[in-house]
UniProtKB/Swiss-Prot annotation:
Subcellular location: Cell membrane
Protein name: Probable multidrug resistance protein NorM
Segments passing through the bilayer: 15-34, 47-69, 89-111, 132-154, 164-186, 193-215, 248-270, 283-302, 317-339, 388-410, 420-442
GO biological process, one term: monoatomic ion transport
Purpose: Multidrug efflux pump.
Length: 453
């Protein structure tokens, strides 16, 4: 990151931040995407099992990685304020937190996964695949969480191209292992959805190893000497980190877990409905990688400018990110409307699943505008380290408005499973409105401070 003077310079620098992040997020998502699509071609039962397992795993992983994402705004503001010497301590303490969080998640999972699955009254093969999927994914928790911290450090320096290269190097491993283990090719055992979990876990370890090597040997990362001193765990540092990270993590958890909760509540419907819902939701999540990537770029850019006390520049980066997100949303809405048949065909050859997935995809169009506002706005707020109000707004919009409304529509109207999608759309719209108002308030506060000084 460097200081910019004109709007065109900001747009160029933002694009240089965004594009590698986008490729990275798409590559990471591709692991889940290939898990889902390839499992679906194994059988509808494998697809449903992976859907249930993923719906339990994703909220946990995204919530905790959200906490660890606090590394990015903290390091970005330190670099912006010329405090490079403080960066290694922050990163190492975050790594310690990542490892501790990993063991806590694994321990909790040992006692809760089986009761949760038993309580869902799934078909026996679906429950078995989901349980095995989660057991294997647990082995990849430590590398995934640790990588999240190290990636936050790399991205905060504006070197998002590096994380892009790391992920692109790892993606083929995931795809090849999926091909071998899901379908049993070249003499490997045919494991179906369980093979997808093994492939993803192995890939997480590869990503971590590559990242550690790059940070230790390549500039500008090596000059920070991140691994030179293994600092003692500092509870005061953990407290400061968690003060920022916990609201970020819970906001992300509330947002992602509502989709997972809907998938779990879909267990009352048929396996065909679960599979179709998962296919449509998976593609909607694929499109979500764009506003998410814009949000991550905004956190870096806004955090850097706030650290340097250039508040007007931070405000301009916010508008750039939201404007780009809305443009992409329009493009994706057109894509969903005209190519719903082709998109559904990616996930399944089953006629019933295909038809129902097309119906769900139409609702995904309405997600686009709300996501284009809510997600980038949260990224900008993280750059300001303003996270507590966003947490409350997200909780209300998704869990107080969206999910209860979806349940009512699904249970007491003819909308059935589609009622959940309508509830989500309304909740997302409220969330986007609340968050945008908060961003304007924060920008006004910092602009006023800047004018007074």
């Amino acid at each position: 990151m460097k200081e910019t003077n004109s709007f065109s310079q900001k747009l160029k620098q933002f694009a240089l931040l965004f594009f590698p992040i986008f490729v990275t997020q798409m590559s990471l998502f591709a692991m889940s995407f290939f898990d889902t699509t390839m499992s679906g071609h194994a059988s509808p039962i494998d697809l449903a099992g992976v859907a249930i397992g993923t719906s339990i795993w994703i909220p946990v992983s995204t919530g905790l990685t959200g906490i660890l994402m606090a590394t990015t705004p903290i390091v970005a503001q330190l670099v912006g304020s010329k405090k490079k010497e403080d960066v290694p301590h922050v990163v190492i303490q975050a790594v310690y937190l990542a490892i501790c969080a990993s063991f806590v998640v694994i321990l909790i999972g040992l006692f809760t996964v089986t009761p949760i699955l038993n309580g869902m009254r799934l078909e026996e093969p679906v429950e078995r695949i989901a349980a095995q999927f989660l057991s294997i994914i647990a082995i990849g928790i430590i590398p995934l969480f640790t990588y999240t911290v190290l990636r936050g450090f790399i991205d905060a320096l504006g070197k998002t191209r590096t994380t892009m290269i790391i992920t692109l190097l790892s993606l083929p491993i995931n795809v090849i292992l999926n091909y071998l283990l899901i379908f049993g090719n070249f003499g490997f055992p045919k494991l179906g959805g369980v093979g997808a979990a093994i492939a993803s876990t192995a890939t997480y370890w590869c990503i971590l190893i590559i990242t550690v090597i790059i940070i230790h040997t390549k500039e500008p990362f090596a000059s920070f000497n991140i691994f030179k001193h293994l600092y003692r765990p500092s509870l005061s540092s953990w407290k400061a980190f968690l003060k920022l990270g916990v609201p970020i993590g819970f906001a992300i958890f509330f947002e992602t877990s509502i989709f997972a909760a809907v998938t779990l509540m879909m267990s009352n419907f048929s396996t065909t409905t679960i599979a179709a819902h998962q296919a449509a939701m998976n593609f909607a999540s694929l499109l979500y990688m764009t506003p998410l990537s814009l949000a991550m770029a905004m956190t870096i850019a806004v955090g850097f400018e706030v650290g340097a006390k250039r508040y007007n520049n931070a405000k301009q980066y916010g508008f750039i990110g939201i404007g780009l997100a809305l443009a992409f949303a329009l493009l994706y809405s057109i894509l969903l409307y005209f190519f719903d048949n082709e998109i559904a065909s990616i996930y399944t050859t089953d006629i019933q699943v295909h038809h129902l997935a097309k119906e769900f995809l139409i609702f995904a169009i309405l997600f686009q505008i709300s996501d284009a506002i809510a997600t980038p706005v949260q990224g900008a707020l993280r750059g300001y380290k303003d996270v507590n109000v966003a947490l409350i707004m997200t909780l209300i919009a998704y869990w107080v408005i969206g999910l209860p409304l979806g349940y009512i529509l699904a249970t007491y109207t003819d909308w059935a499973a589609k009622g959940y999608w309508i509830g989500l759309i309304i909740g997302l719209a409220f969330g986007a409105t609340f968050l945008l108002i908060r961003l304007f308030q924060v920008q006004r506060k910092y602009t006023t401070q800047n004018n007074r000084s």
